Amino acid sequence: MRKKLAKVKVHIQSLDSLLSSMTMPIIGIFIAWGLLASFFIPSGWTPDKNLALMVGIGIQYVIPTIIXFFGGKKIYEIRGGVIAVIIAIAVIAAGQTEAFTKIVGQKSVMFLGVMIFGPIAALILKHTEKFWIHRIKSGFEMLVNNFYLGFLGFALIFPSFYLSIYLIGYIQLGLKLLVEIMQQYKLYPIAAIVIEPAKVLFLNNAINHGVLTPLGLQQVRDSGKSILFLLESNPGPGLGLLVAFLIFFFKRDKKLSSNAASSSPIHLFGGIHEVYFPFVLLKPVLILATIAVGVVGNGILQIFNAGTIAPVSPGSVIAGFLQINKTPLDVAGYALALVLSAVTSLLISLLLLSLTRKKQLKTLQEAQAQVAEMKQTPAKKPRQKDTPAIATKIDFSQVTFVCDAGMGSSTMGAAIFRKELKNQNIEDITVINKAIVDLKDEKVIITISQLYDRVKAKRADATIYTINQFLDKQGYLTIIEKIKNEKN
């Protein structure tokens, strides 16, 4: 049963990775588009009818096409991206038809459609051409490959077009009605019951980019802003929890308190929420605190009718104020939600830590023992081929940090690791970071323990080191010592 649950978790996290890989690389485009909207739409700072045309073109055509390209590229590299763009043409056109408008009630931004059908088209291309791609006569590769991609894309346009009208149409109608019900009956606060536990299970990207972003962008198109972008990205709950750990363990556990202190600015200003997830996992009852605080924060946002004009990603307070709709109520609502959710999270977390102090200490000891045990597992040890007499020498010239999206937390961990290598005068090791889906032939990998199963499934023959979190400096020092011993 446990193995089945582990497999389900891996599949869900893989879906999360695919969804985030379509949107995370183009956050800069969302920011630029959001600035265009904030300046030039009729309700913007400097309305301009002509310049506002760029806003509509960007949200209707450009952004969905790029999302589809990245979705296909993650499945089958450039060829997968190209066929996904062909499918995006069909999906976007479907959202402009009268049949779709009759179902949904309006023309729609087709993010959901391109996120589904783009990767599916790339999968079909990948698994059909593998049977004959290596049999092409020399000199005909370009001709055959391009014609096959073109003909297959042409064939897939038609099912994608009609499925987008009817299947995606009714899905979007259902989601639209759900959002309208939440708005009408003031139900946004209860969204925290789903969002906060899912974040701790590293499904934050799936929720934010797979669900809230497409719905939010549709709301922006209709009303100029959306509260949905703020439901997952509010850094208040995590900030309060980290400060609670800093205070509660200041004398009890200096190392844990120090980790919480160093994680707080990264969480608040860097927008990397993953840094507080391990603290919740040390004491799972704190999930109740994050849920309660999420309800408080979302409630304040709803009372003030606050919203942003574009996705808040990463979930930084800087990005939040940059994208917030520029009216006094919106700005005040966001600021108040941030402050009160942080304070409430601090108080509830301190209360729960105090009430369960003995259990907490025991849990911390068990967690430390578990980490120590992980360091002795094959995942921590340099892997060797099954050769009884001669050990295989490991190539440490490049170390790859791996996280789900390959952007936020792994970038931070790689930077810390580079600094520790520099402090020890080790200059012959290159440190890079990647997403799990981008792994190919890496020899040495560092990741967090929660992602070990997925990394192992992708690169079973690599040397994989796991750490408790990407801010674990002591874990990095331990790995560096092992690398030095292996090299010597």
Swiss-Prot record:
Ranges in the topological domain labelled Cytoplasmic: 1-26, 74-147, 200-289, 354-488
This protein's UniProt keywords: Cell membrane, Kinase, Membrane, Phosphoprotein, Phosphotransferase system, Sugar transport, Transferase, Transmembrane, Transmembrane helix, Transport
EC number: 2.7.1.197
Note on domains (UniProt): The EIIC type-2 domain forms the PTS system translocation channel and contains the specific substrate-binding site.
Species for this entry: Mycoplasma pneumoniae (strain ATCC 29342 / M129 / Subtype 1)
Gene transcribed to yield this protein: mtlA
Molecular function terms from GO: kinase activity; protein-N(PI)-phosphohistidine-mannitol phosphotransferase system transmembrane transporter activity; protein-phosphocysteine-sugar phosphotransferase activity
PTS EIIB type-2 domain boundaries: 397-488
Record-annotated active site: C403
Cellular compartment(s): Cell membrane
Domain of life: Bacteria
GO biological process: phosphoenolpyruvate-dependent sugar phosphotransferase system
UniProt xrefs under SUPFAM superfamilies: PTS system IIB component-like
Main localization of the protein described in the UniProt heading: membrane
Classification via CDD domains: PTS_IIB_mannitol (cd05567)
Protein's name according to its UniProt entry: PTS system mannitol-specific EIICB component
Cellular-component GO terms for this entry: plasma membrane
Pfam families in the cross-refs: PTS_EIIC (PF02378), PTS_IIB (PF02302)
Extracellular side of membrane: 49-52, 170-178, 310-331
Spans through the membrane: 27-48, 53-73, 148-169, 179-199, 290-309, 332-353
Subunit structure, interactors included: Homodimer.
Reactions this protein catalyses: D-mannitol(out) + N(pros)-phospho-L-histidyl-[protein] = D-mannitol 1-phosphate(in) + L-histidyl-[protein]
